[in-house]
Amino acid sequence: MKKKFSLIAMAGAALLLLTACGTTAVTSSSTNLWDQIVYGFAQVIRFLSFGGLTGVGIILFTIVIRAALLPLMNIQIKSSQRMQEIQPEIKKIQAKYPSKDMESRRLMNEEIQKLYAENKVNPYMGCLPLVVQMPVLWALYQALSRVDFLKHGTFLWFEIGAKDPTFILPILAAVFTFLSSYLMMKSAPERNAMTTSMTYIMPIFILIMGVNFAAGIALYWVISNAFQVFQTMLLANPYKIIAAREAKVQVEKDKIKAREKALKKARKK
């Protein structure tokens, strides 16, 4: 979660940097490679803008991107679930090496890496979907600020290339970010202070960025995080995971009771 927050902070800083670096209009005659990519994104959104509604184009564009990432997200979710399940084992290994000297740290890391390999866990997989989305977000921001037909497009109550005057989109983006993080946290067998704090900090960070960036970017975050909530409920429903975990624990308890009952009967004979 901390790595994810750091990546989002980097994305925000990159957006600010791009704002300063690229300010000239992008057209079909632009020769710079990055400008051509930006214009290509703009053309895709334009193609998806049914009825000339740029907002519809951004919504459909976001859904297409998220749908394309589904296989990767599915792998990430399964890896995260396995990571959550082995947390008790990781804590045992950490308790085994309380010393902070280099040799103890090396041995501890070796055991943890071995545990990861045995359970097919990649601790960096959770950040991969976000890393893939970062260039998309940067290109979208540039398209909204440098391509005229997107910059001056309107949808519902807001202008695509300007800030949302009502703050509705930034608030919705923050709400869906919270729901997404909360659902992922809810299924964890154990919760730590860092995960809990990031669940509340990240929505605030998204809210601040949503207020300061173009409404089109905030709309992208709203749809992207709403899709994430839907995806979590579909692929990693925390309520089903908790129910399955409790059922597994109950089965183990029933086995223990059955063994104890069998032992009592054997003693009576």
UniProtKB/Swiss-Prot annotation:
> Biological process GO terms, please?
protein insertion into membrane; protein transport
Q: Give the residue numbers of the N-palmitoyl cysteine lipid attachment.
A: 21
What sections of the sequence does the record tag as coiled-coil?
none
Transmembrane residue ranges: 45-65, 124-144, 165-185, 203-223
GO cellular component labels: plasma membrane
| GO terms of molecular function | membrane insertase activity
Q: Where is the signal peptide?
A: 1-20
Q: Tell me the compartments it is located in.
A: Cell membrane
Keywords (alphabetical) are: Cell membrane, Chaperone, Lipoprotein, Membrane, Palmitate, Protein transport, Signal, Transmembrane, Transmembrane helix, Transport
Q: How does the UniProt record describe the way this protein sits in the membrane?
A: Multi-pass membrane protein
Q: Does the keyword Plastid apply?
A: no
Q: Which family does it belong to?
A: Belongs to the OXA1/ALB3/YidC family. Type 2 subfamily.
Kindly give the HAMAP family that the UniProt entry links to this protein: YidC_type2 (MF_01811)
PANTHER family the UniProt entry points to: CYTOCHROME C OXIDASE ASSEMBLY PROTEIN COX18, MITOCHONDRIAL, OXA1
State what protein this is by name: Membrane protein insertase YidC 1
> Which organism is this protein's natural source?
Lactococcus lactis subsp. lactis (strain IL1403)
